């Protein structure tokens, strides 16, 4: 198989220099969750598109990695929360290997946050409260889709949705038992700020012996 000629696409020439800000130990919060809150609020205030979008990486029982974009739906001192179908590929991965990595990329701010940690399901009460806050179409979609399973064509999905709309017409939509939330409880959080000459700032928090340890990593 021949490779695409890089001279046509100039992929090797695609680069930018980062010059906006620095990230110094003396300026960050000792608590990485509070530091994340500060950066997240700045991303929201900058009106970035979907600042809560994050890459979620998981690994299957046979060591096959996979990654996808999901939306952060909450965070606190216990961790970072997202919701999905428990029977999806990521759900099956997490049932067998309950560890994950998250990545936030805020290009306009030249910032990245990496998170690694153990994953647990959130409580039924938390999941119920969030499901009931979702738009009605999203609630129906959670029933209509057998996420990650092969489907014949789009019409099948549309027909399922139409049938569900009729079934639950003028009544509340219950939460599917196969749908709910996960919390990634971090043991590592790294903050990355782009700098000139590829000498980026990387500050990494590691949780050890009941406390967070802050270290600078080489770029």
Curated annotation (Swiss-Prot):
Metabolic or biological pathway, per its Swiss-Prot or TrEMBL entry: Cofactor metabolism; pyridoxal 5'-phosphate salvage; pyridoxal 5'-phosphate from pyridoxamine 5'-phosphate: step 1/1; Cofactor metabolism; pyridoxal 5'-phosphate salvage; pyridoxal 5'-phosphate from pyridoxine 5'-phosphate: step 1/1
Superkingdom as given in the UniProt entry: Bacteria
Native source species: Acaryochloris marina (strain MBIC 11017)
UniProt GO BP: pyridoxine biosynthetic process
Cofactor(s) this protein requires: FMN
Catalytic activity as recorded in UniProt: pyridoxamine 5'-phosphate + O2 + H2O = pyridoxal 5'-phosphate + H2O2 + NH4(+); pyridoxine 5'-phosphate + O2 = pyridoxal 5'-phosphate + H2O2
Similarity comment: family membership: Belongs to the pyridoxamine 5'-phosphate oxidase family.
Residues involved in FMN binding: 68-73, 83-84, 89-90, 112, 147-148, 192, 202
Protein name (Swiss-Prot/TrEMBL): Pyridoxine/pyridoxamine 5'-phosphate oxidase
Gene3D superfamilies: Electron Transport, Fmn-binding Protein, Chain A
